[in-house]
């Protein structure tokens, strides 16, 4: 089980990303717009750099919803491989069966 503070830190990052998503998209659109003037693009780049670091979605880490484990997480389920295996063996994940051929 991961430390509670790490799980809470990731939750705080997710909240920050949601909060600034629209503003980041707007600034990135200006920066990537070929028709925008150089001054507008520079101003947008400055504003983007002034946003909090944790507002960037790249800084998020996928964590297991049950244990908080940062590695081995299946993004389709949001659960770490070890917990996913336990749930599958108990039949608690619908539509997943053990492979046999």
From Swiss-Prot:
Please list every transmembrane segment annotated in the UniProt record, as residue ranges.
none
One Gene Ontology MF term: structural constituent of ribosome
GO cellular component term, pick one = small ribosomal subunit
One GO biological-process annotation of the entry reads: translation
Pfam families associated with the record: Ribosomal_S14
Keyword hit for rRNA processing: no
The record ties this protein, via InterPro entries, to: Ribosomal_uS14, Ribosomal_uS14_bac/plastid
Q: Where is this region: Disordered?
A: 36-61
Q: Where is the composition biased (Polar residues)?
A: 47-59
Alphabetical keyword list: Ribonucleoprotein, Ribosomal protein, RNA-binding, rRNA-binding
| Family recorded in the similarity comment | Belongs to the universal ribosomal protein uS14 family.
Per UniProt, subunit arrangement is: Part of the 30S ribosomal subunit. Contacts proteins S3 and S10.
What this protein is reported to do is described as:
Binds 16S rRNA, required for the assembly of 30S particles and may also be responsible for determining the conformation of the 16S rRNA at the A site.
From the Swiss-Prot or TrEMBL record, give the protein name.
Answer: Small ribosomal subunit protein uS14
Organism encoding this protein = Methylobacillus flagellatus (strain ATCC 51484 / DSM 6875 / VKM B-1610 / KT)
The gene that this protein is the product of is rpsN
């Amino acid at each position: 089980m991961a430390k509670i503070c790490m799980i809470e830190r990731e939750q705080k990052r997710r909240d920050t990303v949601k909060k600034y998503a629209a503003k980041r998209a707007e600034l990135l659109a200006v920066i990537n717009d070929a028709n925008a003037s150089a001054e507008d693009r520079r101003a947008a780049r400055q504003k983007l750099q002034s946003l909090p670091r944790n507002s960037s979605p790249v800084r998020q880490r996928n964590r297991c919803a049950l244990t908080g484990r940062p590695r081995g997480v299946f993004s389709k389920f949001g659960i770490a491989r070890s917990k996913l295996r336990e749930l599958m063996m108990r039949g608690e994940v619908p539509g997943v069966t053990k492979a046999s051929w």
